[in-house]
């Protein structure tokens, strides 16, 4: 893909004028009641997410705060944990385009070497996807969230509940313990998935995979060139360029 095409894509996913994201208010009601100073007044500006433009809204407990989008403490980080740029990916293990883009994103992050990659599970492809997402979140107790994610996203066929168990076991994960941890932490895990869904809905994502790259949004599976251009532009914006 030529650079001018990549830049056109970046212009496409960047919004041209400020707008109020009304859907975010509806999404937030699935988590808690909102007030006049809630997500309903969050703005997007010229392709960027207005995290810093509206500090009064970026408070603890706000699922659209910079902290909860980029640095949610409940989600382990892949890539460079001290990287200067964060990429957040909303994905589903049964999304064919998520599986297609998985090795591309891994290569881009590995070659860059300075990116924090945050996998946020957004299971929208049915009960098997929900089960798989819950089970992977339950592997955090073993310190194997990223390993579990990588194993299931490397699947070449639809992930079933039995298939998820088998794949994770083959990847060296204690599935019995993960299931026990899932039952023990079911409420917290369900809250995390609801939060991811509310965030994705608030950002007007139409499906998986969807990305937040710095303060840009990007939809769908793309090639290396598009991701690298998005990363370069995101770094430029964060540096005030």
Name each region found by the language model.
Residues 26, 56-60:
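Boundary at the C-terminal end of the N-terminal hydrophobic targeting segment
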Residues 39, 170-241:
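C-terminal cap of thioredoxin/glutaredoxin-like
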Residues 86-171, 203-206, 237:
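Structural alpha/beta surface segment adjacent to cysteine/selenocysteine redox centers
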């Amino acid at each position: 893909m030529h650079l001018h095409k990549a830049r056109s894509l970046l212009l496409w996913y960047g919004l041209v004028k400020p707008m109020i994201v009304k859907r975010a208010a509806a999404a937030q009601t699935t988590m808690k009641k909102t007030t006049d100073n809630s997500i309903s007044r969050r703005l997007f500006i010229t392709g960027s997410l207005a995290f810093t433009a509206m500090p009064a809204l970026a408070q603890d407990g706000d699922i659209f705060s910079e902290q909860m989008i980029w640095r949610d403490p409940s989600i382990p980080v892949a890539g460079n944990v001290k990287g200067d740029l964060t990429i957040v990916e909303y994905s589903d293990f049964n999304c064919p385009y998520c599986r297609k883009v998985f090795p591309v994103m891994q290569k881009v992050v590995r070659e860059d070497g300075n990116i924090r990659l945050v996998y946020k599970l957004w299971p929208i492809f049915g009960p098997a996807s929900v089960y798989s997402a819950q089970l992977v979140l339950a592997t955090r107790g073993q310190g194997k969230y990223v390993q579990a994610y990588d194993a299931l996203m490397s699947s070449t066929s639809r992930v079933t509940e039995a298939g998820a168990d088998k794949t994770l076991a083959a990847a060296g994960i204690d599935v019995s313990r993960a299931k026990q941890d899932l039952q023990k932490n079911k409420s917290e895990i369900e809250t995390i998935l609801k939060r991811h869904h509310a965030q994705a809905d608030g950002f007007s994502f139409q499906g998986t995979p969807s990305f937040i790259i710095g303060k840009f949004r990007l939809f769908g599976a793309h090639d290396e060139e598009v991701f690298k251009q998005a990363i370069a532009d995101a770094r430029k914006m964060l540096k005030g360029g």
